Amino acid sequence: MKLKDYTIYIVTLLIVACSPSYNLQSIDDEVIAIEAPIDSTILNIILPYQNSIEAQMNEVLCISKMEMKKGKPESLLGNFVTDLCLEQFSESADVCIMNTGGIRSTLPKGKITRGEIYKLMPFENELVVLELNKSDFDGMLEYIASRGGEPFSGMKFNSSKESRELQVFSLGENFNFNKEDKVRVLTSDYLANGGDKMWFFKNKEQLKLGTKLRDAIINYCSNSDTISSKLDNRLTITEDE
């Protein structure tokens, strides 16, 4: 290092070392608006895409006969979503389960647009099927009951409120665990990977169906003039005697 450079280096260190230290006492923040003219060239590029997307989102898919909301122990919206999924993939699955938290909005009565479905299901979740043995299946039922209900389709069962004693009323046709059968469960890849504490799905092989949950809803609505749902007591939670 040259003598001149070395001298500058030493002086700089001394200045920094001898400088008084400061403590931050307060911060004042202020929003400063940046005013800039809109670039017409960029705007002309963006507008066609914006108009195309708006046209797609405003497309009317079907008419809903009722307003559908999520809720527990069962709901019109939860039953609607899981029923339509199981209907479309009945050859691959016996039951379907989703989670209330994954349903992000309500479906209004009247016109249902593509945009409404995107608000309902904004995530890119894929549909998958997993096989559960009796132990894991019972764990799934206990999970649903412990949370006061989650959206499911393809079965009906009762749970006592305190003891969590389970009684399955119906599960497919001619289904028998005595034959060491496994239940094929349709769900989202997020839940299949243990999301929302669905531990009974962990480390299970997943059959990917190549369809997003949102697309399954859109497909169903697109192929229906009208849609509706109903409550059928698929889950009842009773008081212990």
Give the positions of each predicted feature.
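Acidic/histidine-rich, surface-exposed loop or edge segments in extracytoplasmic proteins
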Residues: 55-69, 197-201
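PLD-like (HKD) phosphodiesterase/transphosphatidyltransferase domain
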Residues: 34-35, 49, 53, 65-67
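Feature captures C-terminal
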Residues: 21-35, 79-82, 86-95, 100-241
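Sec-dependent signal peptide recognition
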Residues: 4-11
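A conserved active-site cap/scaffold subdomain adjacent to cofactor or substrate pockets
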Residues: 70, 75-76
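Contiguous mid-protein beta-loop-alpha structural module that forms a pocket-lining wall or clamp
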Residues: 23, 40-47
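C-terminal motif of bacterial Sec signal peptides marking the signal peptidase cleavage site
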Residues: 15-17
